[in-house]
Curated annotation (Swiss-Prot):
Protein name listed in UniProt: Bifunctional protein PyrR
GO molecular function: uracil phosphoribosyltransferase activity
Gene3D superfamilies: 3.40.50.2020
Name of the gene this protein is made from: pyrR
HAMAP family per the UniProt record, alphabetical: PyrR (MF_01219)
EC number: 2.4.2.9
UniProt binding sites for substrate: 42-43, 87, 104-112, 137, 161
Keyword Transcription: yes
Superkingdom, taxonomy of origin: Bacteria
InterPro entries, per the entry: PRibTrfase_dom, PRTase-like, PyrR, PyrR_bifunctional
General function of this protein: Regulates the transcription of the pyrimidine nucleotide (pyr) operon in response to exogenous pyrimidines. Also displays a weak uracil phosphoribosyltransferase activity which is not physiologically significant.
Short sequence motif PRPP-binding: positions: 100-112
Reaction equations catalysed: UMP + diphosphate = 5-phospho-alpha-D-ribose 1-diphosphate + uracil
Length: 183
């Protein structure tokens, strides 16, 4: 793998973006009462953990957190792998009467979010669902929009946005690549 085309967010910029998103969530929801944070595998989970911790720190209430595997809800499952890896879904609380903040790293076509919404609705009927993403790169194929965005990043369709997080990759950074640079 060669050097990235550009660094989109540094570690400090990721931290600041998540802090801003936490404040926006609190403002829109008039606090953190009745909120729950659910991260989409894989990198949505550590982002959700960080957001939940920040919300708890700012509001003084424990925000329930969960993780969602959308593998079986994807509309491209046959293209992903012959034997898809099924990860764990953990939502150890009742969704009823909660506003759920669904968290993912990158919003692109909207298909991952659509699958996450299907998976979430199968678990219960929350009061509402809001979407928080670290990067929105455009190119939507479905009518889906994030409620909270760390960075809007217009990209070419062929470009690749790579999010690396301390919990999964040992570092916090968001980089932009041309596909041939990832070979």
């Amino acid at each position: 793998m060669t050097a990235p085309k550009a660094t989109i967010l540094s570690s400090d910029e990721i931290r600041r973006a998540l802090t801003r998103i936490a404040h926006e969530i609190i403002e829109r929801n008039k606090g953190a009462e009745n909120l729950a944070i659910i991260g989409v595998h894989t990198r949505g989970i550590p982002l959700a953990e960080r957001l939940a911790s920040k919300l708890s720190e700012l509001e003084g209430v424990e925000v329930p957190r969960g993780m969602l595997d959308i593998t079986l809800y994807r509309d491209d499952l046959s293209e992903v792998a012959r034997q898809p890896i099924i990860r764990e879904t953990q939502v150890p609380f009742d969704l009823a009467d909660r506003r759920v903040i669904l968290v993912d790293d990158v919003l692109y076509t909207g298909r991952t979010v659509r699958a996450a919404l299907d998976a979430l609705i199968d678990l219960g009927r929350p009061e509402g669902i809001q979407l928080a993403v670290l990067v929105d790169r455009g190119h939507r194929e479905l009518p889906i929009r994030a409620d909270y965005v760390g960075k809007n990043l217009p990209t070419a369709k062929h470009e690749v946005v790579k999010v690396k997080l301390q919990e999964t990759d040992g570092t916090d950074i968001v980089e932009l690549f041309d596909p041939e640079d990832l070979q």
